């Protein structure tokens, strides 16, 4: 008695590779209220502070970024609202 083993390889099976995401704040980058290029990455078009889930920051980084965004707004480095739309 012979046993047949189906050795067909599924053509629909694909190997997927995940690309590593860059960290939102690089290790050498300094979070500061004067670093507007960094702070603007964590603000939406409506000038709202993005959530941790969207910005992929740690909770400590999120608190720091939020504090410095608020300081930059008070010192008039950043707008409170965006009236472009």
Swiss-Prot record:
UniProt cross-references to InterPro entries, sorted A to Z: Ribosomal_bS18, Ribosomal_bS18_sf
CC annotations in GO: chloroplast; mitochondrial small ribosomal subunit
Offer one example of a GO biological process linked to this entry.
translation
PANTHER family assigned to the protein according to its UniProt record, in alphabetical order: 30S RIBOSOMAL PROTEIN S18, SMALL RIBOSOMAL SUBUNIT PROTEIN BS18M
Name used for this protein in its record: Small ribosomal subunit protein bS18c
Sorted UniProt keywords: Chloroplast, Plastid, Ribonucleoprotein, Ribosomal protein, RNA-binding, rRNA-binding
Q: Which organism is it from?
A: Zygnema circumcarinatum (Green alga)
| Assembly notes | Part of the 30S ribosomal subunit.
**Could you cite one Gene Ontology molecular function of this protein?**
structural constituent of ribosome
Gene field:
rps18
What Pfam families does this protein's entry cite? Ribosomal_S18 (PF01084)
Question: Which cell locations does it reside in?
Answer: Plastid, Chloroplast
**What are the disulfide bonds?**
none
* Similarity comment text for this entry: Belongs to the bacterial ribosomal protein bS18 family.
């Amino acid at each position: 008695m012979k046993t047949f083993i189906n050795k067909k390889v599924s053509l629909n099976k694909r190997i997927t590779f995940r690309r590593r995401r860059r960290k939102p704040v690089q290790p050498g980058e300094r979070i500061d209220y004067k670093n507007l290029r960094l702070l603007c990455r964590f603000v939406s078009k409506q000038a709202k502070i993005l959530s941790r889930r969207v910005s992929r920051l740690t909770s400590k980084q999120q608190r720091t970024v939020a504090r410095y965004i608020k300081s930059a707004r008070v010192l008039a480095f950043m707008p409170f609202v965006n009236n472009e739309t």
